[in-house]
């Protein structure tokens, strides 16, 4: 049974691969299937719009689809993601997202010379301790965007 997991996540390919690898390991260990592919879909600006992961389950049963849904919710993927197969679709996901856009060109040179984005990440993750963390980022011409996902958007902001 072939399924498409449409992730409501702005993951760079390398970060999507991390999720694919974790899923593959669990699917292999349980004998329930395998990850067969994936992709990252971008907006015209180059910023990631969403991601997809292709999954093949060994047995085409409602029980296995529910098992996969529960697994994805336990692992933690963004809300409004979906599992799609044969014209069917179910919503999956438990995490809420927050994007932080850092201006990369309009501030004074001093700001860029003295400020480290890694410090910003560290401080934001520290403030979100136990609620959320950074999953990915994107560097555009004008902005660097940090993508955080966690249990509550309200508490993360």
What are these regions (language model features)?
Residues 19-23, 64-75, 117-124, 157:
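Short amphipathic alpha-helices in soluble, non-transmembrane regions
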Residues 31-63, 133-155:
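Short, intrinsically disordered low-complexity segments
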Residues 12-18, 60-68, 111, 153-157:
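Short, conserved charged micro-motifs
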Residues 46-91:
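Long amphipathic alpha-helical segments with strong coiled-coil/leucine-zipper propensity
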Residues 72-120:
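Surface-exposed beta-loop interaction hotspot
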Residues 1-24, 96-105:
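Short, extreme N-terminal segment that most often corresponds to the first beta-strand
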Residues 26-35, 76-78, 125-131:
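Short secondary-structure junctions
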Residues 112, 116-139:
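Intrinsically disordered, low-complexity segments enriched in Gly and acidic/Ser/Thr residues
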């Amino acid at each position: 049974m072939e399924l498409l997991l449409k992730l409501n996540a702005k993951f760079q390919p390398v970060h999507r691969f991390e999720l694919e690898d974790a899923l593959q390991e669990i699917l292999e260990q349980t004998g329930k299937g395998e990850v067969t592919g994936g992709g990252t879909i971008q907006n015209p600006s180059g910023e990631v719009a969403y991601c997809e992961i292709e999954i093949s389950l060994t047995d085409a049963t409602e029980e296995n689809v529910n098992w996969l849904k529960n697994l994805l919710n336990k692992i933690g993927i963004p809300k409004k993601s979906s599992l799609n197969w044969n014209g069917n679709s179910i919503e999956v996901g438990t995490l809420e997202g927050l994007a932080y856009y850092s201006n990369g060109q309009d501030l004074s040179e001093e700001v860029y010379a003295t400020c480290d984005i890694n410090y910003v990440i560290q401080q934001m993750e520290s403030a979100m301790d136990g609620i959320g963390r950074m999953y990915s980022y994107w560097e555009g011409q004008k902005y660097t965007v940090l993508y955080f996902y966690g249990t509550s958007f309200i508490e993360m902001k």
